Design a protein with these regions (language model features):
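Acidic, polar-rich low-complexity tracts and alpha-helical solenoid repeat scaffolds
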Residues: 3-4, 16-247
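Bacterial N-terminal signal peptides
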Residues: 9-16
Length: 247
């Protein structure tokens, strides 16, 4: 497994360095790395994010072995993030963490990658692949860099991501209930109760489990969920609604 990862990293590095040569035009002047970097910073400060990205990219292509190149890669990713080019930012950051796993700003690279997916989170009615990527990325930041300044914000955002993922399950579960398919609905609500029990959707998920089980005639099962709802959320509105269901 380690050999496979190492081989993959070598391939990434080789492709990245090979592309440096292909990106350079025959008649393109090689500009000093520091000059390109300063130009990128100037464009960034002026709000010209795509132009800034292009300048930082030149550092990588023209000076792949320069000491400032890793920082230019990060700044290129940041410029793309600000420009709303999140997929491109993620691609740059994926290469960065392969090339520079021990860089002093490696925590920021993982954090910015997670943010690039986080900002693409869509409505619960739509595909949630970016939400799942954000979830994985934020968890990785917390796991790898628990003492970093990014871990705190990652934890806060992770709560919101989990709430969003729970919302997706609730949306699908309610749909199944509306179609009189309580068996399929139960599977969705159980995911919320078991995997997202700290989110704001947990009380309603328990209520919907009561409702779904009653539709199936499983009164004892419904009462079990009612007990959990009453114990965990005694003052919640969904607990009060459940009382009416079981009368």
């Amino acid at each position: 497994m380690n050999f496979t990862k190492s081989l993959f990293s070598v391939i990434i590095v080789t492709l990245a360095l090979t592309s440096c040569k292909s990106k350079l035009k025959d008649n393109e002047d090689v500009v000093p790395a520091q000059e390109l970097y300063r130009s990128g910073i100037k464009e960034l400060e002026s709000g010209e994010y795509k132009k800034a990205s292009a300048e930082f990219e030149k550092v990588f292509f023209q000076h792949p072995g320069n000491s400032i190149t890793p920082q230019a890669e990060l700044m290129q990713a940041y410029s793309l993030y600000l420009a709303g080019e999140y997929e491109e930012a993620v691609d740059i950051l994926d290469i960065f963490v392969k090339l520079h796993p021990r860089h002093e700003d490696i925590a920021y690279a993982y954090y910015l990658k997670a943010l690039s997916n986080y900002i693409q989170i869509s409505d619960v009615r739509l595909d949630q692949s970016k939400t799942k990527y954000a979830n994985e990325g934020l968890e990785e930041v917390i796991m790898r860099f628990p003492e970093s300044k990014y871990a705190i914000d990652a934890a806060l955002k992770l709560d919101l991501v989990n709430d969003h993922l729970a919302g997706k399950e609730m949306f699908i579960g309610r749909y199944y209930l509306s179609k009189r398919n309580p068996v399929a609905a139960i599977k969705r609500f159980q995911i919320v109760v078991e995997s997202y029990d700290t989110t704001s959707h947990a009380p309603e998920a328990l209520y919907r489990l009561i409702e779904s089980n009653l539709m199936l005639g499983l009164v004892d099962e419904a009462k079990k969920y009612a007990t959990v709802l009453s114990h965990n959320y005694p003052d919640n509105q969904w607990r009060k609604y459940s009382d009416n269901l079981l009368k």
